[in-house]
């Protein structure tokens, strides 16, 4: 293909456009139709051989499994049952702990936590259990939890979980809110599911540490990004991201649902109050830390998907929050759907929902599709079934000590594709490669990251005031 042909192709791909999705946020059929279109565009990025989405980080596939499970629950859609099950098992690795060998030299505690959360989603959805000779979804979650909690580090900052899992990884010196938020959420979910005090004890321990160190401000309930161990966590990165507060919010909702304690309701209300004021503009969800500067990287475009799911989860666990959270789901879903009018399909979703004018922002990919999908799917949250517990589950296999002292011996050497963050020119090129893949080519396989995990945070020291 000559340069002229490539230029025409790319022009056609990017600017074909289409009228924004005609979503009626009050009509089930309209919501269902919109979700089906979004799902179709999302699955264009699926690669069955790697059991992951291309042109995205490994953790994004884990988070997206949660979205597919919500699709299964809310729309009774069994189309992707085998895909979900296969991906959750394959990516768990031979240790069944979401520490697979192909991610071992790139593993963040947040990555592992995202996959564990997806396995927990499966357990709580009473999702078809794995092969009877394997472990239950609960046991996979417990194994990952034990791996992560085993890395709790009291040698610096008085405790906490580091961002990266192992000392040789860039970012190991950083204690990140997201890693601790995920461990907190897993603790609270496991406490409710199993009714075992070891998990609620962990949830209280993590909450106390994150508030003591200042990651969660108990006056404003702002959630800051984290701090480095070189300063003993005394200098906070003031960046605020929607997914951090969303993950904490869900954990608090589980603890309130499980314990009924007033203190957890107060904490939940504080997080909701800050989340609904800081991360919305004209009642539309946004991440001002990067969207304000038009500078969102490939991690950050997925954050609102997790944030929107956190609203749905919170409503399920604390129904009194419905009147506060659901109207914001509605306005955000409507705006997200208006951004889904680009790319080759004419329905690819962008990320700048706050534009809210039916024009596309030229961004697309797995993360953008995931985020918009979660916003629209949460419109059906009031019809979600009750979240299961071990007592109501069809699979009662549980092992709270699994993988707590297991030596890793994972022989699976398949390499997952991780696209390294680039400058804007590089990002455009990767977008071009992704588009070619969608049309059936395989250029994506050549774009493997060889330098390891790239930090997902924005510029240090730059923060939007609360």
UniProtKB/Swiss-Prot annotation:
Signal peptide: 1-20
Catalytic activity: Random hydrolysis of (1->6)-alpha-D-mannosidic linkages in unbranched (1->6)-mannans
SUPFAM superfamilies reported for this sequence: Six-hairpin glycosidases (SSF48208)
Classification via InterPro entries: 6-hairpin_glycosidase_sf (IPR008928), Glyco_hydro_76 (IPR005198), Mannan-1_6-alpha_mannosidase (IPR014480)
Domain of life: Eukaryota
Gene Ontology molecular-function annotations: mannan endo-1,6-alpha-mannosidase activity
A Pfam family that the UniProt record links to this protein: Glyco_hydro_76
EC number per UniProt: 3.2.1.101
Keywords on record: Glycoprotein, Glycosidase, Hydrolase, Signal
Any one GO BP annotation for this protein: septum digestion after cytokinesis
GO cellular component: external side of plasma membrane
Glycosylation sites: 47, 77, 131, 195, 217, 232, 257, 357, 396, 399, 409, 412
Gene3D superfamilies noted in UniProt: 1.50.10.20
Keyword Kinase: no
Family: Belongs to the glycosyl hydrolase 76 family.
The protein's name: Putative mannan endo-1,6-alpha-mannosidase C1198.06c
């Amino acid at each position: 293909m000559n340069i002229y042909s490539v230029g025409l192709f790319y022009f056609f791909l990017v600017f074909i456009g289409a009228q924004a999705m005609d979503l009626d946020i009050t009509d089930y059929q309209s919501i269902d139709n919109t979700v089906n279109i979004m799902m179709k565009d999302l699955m264009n990025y699926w690669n069955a051989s790697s059991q992951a989405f291309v042109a995205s980080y490994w953790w994004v596939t884990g988070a997206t499994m949660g979205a597919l499970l919500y699709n299964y629950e809310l729309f009774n859609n069994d189309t992707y049952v085998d895909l979900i099950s296969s991906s959750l098992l394959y990516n768990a690795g031979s240790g069944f702990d979401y520490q697979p060998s192909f991610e071992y030299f790139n593993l963040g505690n947040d990555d592992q936590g995202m996959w564990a959360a997806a396995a927990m989603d499966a357990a709580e959805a009473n999702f078809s259990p794995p092969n009877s000779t394997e472990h239950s979804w609960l046991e996979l979650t417990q194994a990952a939890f034990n791996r992560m909690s085993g890395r709790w580090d009291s040698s610096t900052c008085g405790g906490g979980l580091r961002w990266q899992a192992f000392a040789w990884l860039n970012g190991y010196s950083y204690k990140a809110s997201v890693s601790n938020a995920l461990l907190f959420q897993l603790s609270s979910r496991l406490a409710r599911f199993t009714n075992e005090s070891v998990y609620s004890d962990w949830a209280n321990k993590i909450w106390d540490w994150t508030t003591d160190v200042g990651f969660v401000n108990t006056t404003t309930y702002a959630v800051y990004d984290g701090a480095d161990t070189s300063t003993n966590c005394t200098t906070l990165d003031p960046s605020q991201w929607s997914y951090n507060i969303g993950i904490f919010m869900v954990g608090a909702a589980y603890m309130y649902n499980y314990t009924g304690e007033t203190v957890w309701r107060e904490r939940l209300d504080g997080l909701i109050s800050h989340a609904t004021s800081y991360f919305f503009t004209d009642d539309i969800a946004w991440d001002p830390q990067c969207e304000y500067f038009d500078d969102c990287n490939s991690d950050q475009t997925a954050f609102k998907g997790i944030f929107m799911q956190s609203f749905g989860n919170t409503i399920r666990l604390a129904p009194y929050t419905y009147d506060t959270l659901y109207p914001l789901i509605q306005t955000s879903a409507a705006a997200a759907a208006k951004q889904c009018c680009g790319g080759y399909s004419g329905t690819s979703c962008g990320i700048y929902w706050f534009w809210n004018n039916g024009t596309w922002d030229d961004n697309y990919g797995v993360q953008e599709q995931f985020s918009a999908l979660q916003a629209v799917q949460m419109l059906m949250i009031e019809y979600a079934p009750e979240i299961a517990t071990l007592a109501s589950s069809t699979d009662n296999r549980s092992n709270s000590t699994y993988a707590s002292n297991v030596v890793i011996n994972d022989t699976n050497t398949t390499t997952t594709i991780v696209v390294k963050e680039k400058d804007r020119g590089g990002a455009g090129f990767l977008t071009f490669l992704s588009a070619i893949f969608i049309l059936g080519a395989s250029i994506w396989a050549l774009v493997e990251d060889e330098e390891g995990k790239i930090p997902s945070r924005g510029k240090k020291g730059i923060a939007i005031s609360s």
